[in-house]
Amino acid sequence: MQEVISYIQKAVLEISNALKFPDTSYSQNQNFTGDTQLKFDVLSDEIITKTLSQCSSIKAIISEEKDEILTLNEKAKLIVAYDPLDGSSLMDVNFAIGSIFAIYEEKASAKKLRAALYSMYGARLELVICKEQPKLYRLNANNEFIFIKDLKINEKGKINATGGTQKFWEEKHAKFIKSLFDEGYRLRYSGAMVSDINQILLKGGGIFSYPATQDAPNGKLRAFFEVFPLAFIIEKAGGKTTNGKNHSLLELEFDKIHATTPCFFGSKYEISKLLKAYNE
């Protein structure tokens, strides 16, 4: 496991260096789910593929930017699924973006998720690594990731990060969001899931939501690359997650590697309030 994490650190550092002078234009290609790829999406995916291919502990890799699973070593046990550059559409406005990684054992399944990581490419390069407790690391002047602190979520937060086009929201979701604002919650939504989840973790609580909508009844966020790893981190930090029905996103099972799901992450208070609103 530690060997895999060390190779992920190498990939993250290389992506961070490449971001100093990036090409923010679009390519002529689309990924599996129909998103037009930025040239830097492709480059980030190539960097991660190249780096992880050198690790003998990895059985296979699954990328948001690839159609199929890429087998590396049949004798190994660990599978790495990743979003090479979450929030890449925000590159042209210079918002913070990141990479998300899930490490599964034997098969890609929430029940087999053993560790999760994400990087933040912002004013600083930071990395959150979670096996049992999410731990925040920061790159220092010597190009070393230094431990900063454990991350924990309070019972109740103040941040409301909600995605999806509002005119396509279900009425129950619109009412729930309004109830949060009526309680004094602050809107904090960037358009990059990893950045919004990171803020909730570092600020100690709140809620991130990307609901089912009329134009995306199964949600838009991908289970294996985005939803499962970030749900793993949130729950290990003391928070809760749900799809609006289940009591944890990590209870969900999917057959397709690019499957999507509605998803909600946050403090216990907000998720309990959401489940009540959704199931009245």
UniProtKB/Swiss-Prot annotation:
Membrane-crossing residue ranges in chain numbering: none
Places the protein is found: Cytoplasm
Binding residue positions for Mg(2+) 1: 64, 83, 85
Annotated Mg(2+) 2 binding sites: 83, 86, 226
Record's cofactor remark: Binds 2 magnesium ions per subunit.
GO terms assigned for molecular function: fructose 1,6-bisphosphate 1-phosphatase activity; magnesium ion binding
Pathway in which the depicted protein is active: Carbohydrate biosynthesis; gluconeogenesis
Gene3D superfamilies: 3.40.190.80, Fructose-1,6-Bisphosphatase, subunit A, domain 1
GO biological process: fructose 1,6-bisphosphate metabolic process; fructose 6-phosphate metabolic process; fructose metabolic process; gluconeogenesis; sucrose biosynthetic process
PANTHER family recorded: FRUCTOSE-1,6-BISPHOSPHATASE-RELATED, SEDOHEPTULOSE-1,7-BISPHOSPHATASE, CHLOROPLASTIC
Subunit comment: Homotetramer.
Name of this protein: Fructose-1,6-bisphosphatase class 1
Taxonomic lineage of the native organism: Bacteria, Pseudomonadati, Campylobacterota, Epsilonproteobacteria, Campylobacterales
